Every structure is written in C-alpha cells, then in structure tokens.
Amino acid sequence: MKYQLTALEARVIGCLLEKQVTTPEQYPLSVNGVVTACNQKTNREPVMNLSESEVQEQLDNLVKRHYLRTVSGFGNRVTKYEQRFCNSEFGDLKLSAAEVALITTLLLRGAQTPGELRSRAARMYEFSDMAEVESTLEQLANREDGPFVVRLAREPGKRESRYMHLFSGEVEDQPAVTAMSNMVDGDLQTRVEALEIEVAELKQRLDSLLAHLGD
C-alpha cells in the first residue's frame, strides 16, 4: 500500500480532517491550532504532549509529501495548513462523508469496534444505524484502491471485533473472518466521550470568539 504514515503524521492528518468538518470557521489551522488539536485530551488515543517544533516537523514532512498544503496571504498574518490527504482537487483518494468520519476516528484513536466508531464519529457524520457503519467499513476494506481498513481478530471475552486503518502499513493483528456482526451501542464510556468532545469544541469556539472580540 502506498500510504505509510507514522503515528505522528497520522495524528496531524486526523486532526486536520476532524477540524475541517467540526469547526470549519477555524479551518485551515495555524501551527498553534494543530498543536492544540494534536494534544487534545478528548477523542485522542493516546493523549499526546507534542511541542510546536515537533508538530512543525510533521507539517513540513507532510507538505513535502503533498498530503498538506500551506495557505497564506489575503490578510492571513500566519501560515495555515489544510489537508490534501483526501478529496482534494488533484488527489487520487476520494472518500464519502461517512468514510472520512470513520477514517478520521481511526487515525485519531486507533483500533475500535463499530459501536465505538459510530459514537465517536458522530460529530463528523451521523450514521443512521449500525448497519450503515458496518457497510461503510466493509466498503473501505474491499475498495479496489485499498484496502483502507482491516477487521482484527476478536479479543478473548469481547463481543465485538475491532477495526484498524491501514494508512500506517499492515497491522500486526491478523484479520478475523469477514462476516459482520451486529453491535449494540450501549457503552456509557463512549457517550461520555462524545459529550466531552462537544464541550471541548464549544470551549474552543468560545475562546476564538473572545479572541476576536479582544482584537
């Protein structure tokens, strides 16, 4: 597969994909905006504490690889970054809104079950039911230009199998059988996480508004 992202590159791209959908008024992002998004405590696994220089290094590498591009001028006092990873004018990778939501959540949190993905991706795309989540995952796993996700072997004692993206190369865990299983989204933790994400984004918007009022 042609995509070989490091863990930090995956985090940066995932953040830009997320913010493009959830906070479009703040997108593209400055370096500081990317740092804040990368180190966000909600909807991130693992939680990171990257410095500005570490993030800048990743941004520079991704620009060179044509996964990002810089945006400047027209009144912008600082350089900002936008993703060209998917759905860009000249890029090959085209994803639906549902596919973007799942891929982004996998880039930001690693392997997850369909139930977890449905809950955690809700800010980007509202899946009508679990069948739509599973169908989208199956499409990503069987695309001619992919595969982009893989189903992992079910862990002992677990009812659900997890899925992982393949943009960082092959996953060590072996895929289980391809049959889909129906999941019930009743996990309290994922609901709490969804609320935490919403609160964090509201706070970010409020901070941005206060900053504009202070100018």
From Swiss-Prot:
InterPro entries: DUF480 (IPR007432), WH-like_DNA-bd_sf (IPR036388), WH_DNA-bd_sf (IPR036390). Gene3D superfamilies: Winged helix-like DNA-binding domain superfamily/Winged helix DNA-binding domain. The keyword DNA repair does not apply. The modification N6-acetyllysine is found at residue 80. Keywords: Acetylation. Belongs to the UPF0502 family. NCBIfam families: PRK11239.1 (NF008413). This is UPF0502 protein YceH.
